[in-house]
A protein has these predicted regions:
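Short glycine-rich, polar/acidic loop-and-turn segments at beta strand-coil junctions
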Residues: 48-51, 62-63, 68, 102-105, ...
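Electropositive nucleic-acid engagement tracts
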Residues: 2-31, 35-94, 149
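Short, conserved catalytic/metal-binding motifs centered on acidic residues
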Residues: 47, 97-104, 115, 123, ...
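Local beta-strand/beta-hairpin segments that build beta-sheet-rich folds
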Residues: 124-130
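An internal, acidic/charged active-site-proximal segment
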Residues: 130-208
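Structured nucleic-acid-interacting core domains from mobile-element enzymes and related host factors
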Residues: 73-124
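Short acidic/polar alpha-helix capping motifs at helix-coil junctions
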Residues: 8-14, 113, 136-140
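Generic hydrophobic, aliphatic-rich segments that mediate packing or membrane embedding
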Residues: 43, 60, 83, 97-99, ...
């Protein structure tokens, strides 16, 4: 498929998702996505090089920069129908929804907190937020706020399991209140007991 065909396909899809949005923003978003697909890059310079037309490459880059920086383009509102649709379709299969939560350092002083849906050996992004921190983990309130948004997207009758590292331990109480299961990796020297009448054991002693 040529980039022109990709562009028109994305435009029609975006018109359905954000029907009330300005057509100029829809077209710019379509070019941004088309350029990403055909350049296989997220760098605006490479994306702009794939966009056809008489405009100079630098002008294309600046147009994309203005769009990305536009405060009126609310990412979550644009992506909400997509995320809700992914969760609905996955739940309709009758399988447990496996949500992967992860934090990754991006640049200097920022961390991307991302929740994805595990589906057919792929991780499909559902929702994300940025955390300003030079080092360390995201806070419990930030984690809970992100999961609370996703909780509103998940079909009420769906079974859910959340998978993540030990930094997401603050989520345990809220996940239990939603009857969501969770698997959070723990350090080997952490202690646990399987029942009230049993002794505390190191996690690494349970591995066989």
């Amino acid at each position: 498929m040529s980039i022109i065909q990709t562009y028109h396909t994305i435009v029609e899809r975006l018109k359905q998702i954000v029907s009330s949005e300005r057509i100029t923003r829809i077209r710019t978003m379509a070019w941004l996505q088309s350029g990403m697909l055909h350049s296989r890059s997220v760098h605006l310079n490479r994306i702009a090089s794939k966009i056809p037309g008489k405009a100079k490459k630098l002008s294309r880059v600046r147009q994309l920069e203005r769009f990305v920086d536009n405060p009126h383009v609310r990412v979550r509102e644009w992506y909400h129908p997509v995320a809700a649709g992914l969760l609905k379709d996955a739940a309709a299969t009758g399988c447990v929804l496996r949500l992967i939560i992860d934090g990754s350092k991006v640049g200097n002083g920022h961390q991307l907190l991302l929740v994805s849906l595990a589906y057919r050996r792929r991780a499909l992004p559902i929702a994300w937020t940025w955390v300003r921190c030079r080092r360390g983990h995201s806070t419990g309130p930030k984690q809970c706020a992100l999961l609370a948004y996703i909780h509103g997207l998940v079909p009420s009758d769906a079974a859910v399991v959340v998978i993540g590292d030990s930094e997401f331990s603050p989520l345990q109480a809220v996940l239990a209140s939603w009857n969501w299961c969770y698997v959070l990796r723990q350090k080997g020297n952490h202690l646990l007991r399987l029942a009230q009448d049993q002794l505390w054991q190191r996690c690494d002693t349970l591995l066989t």
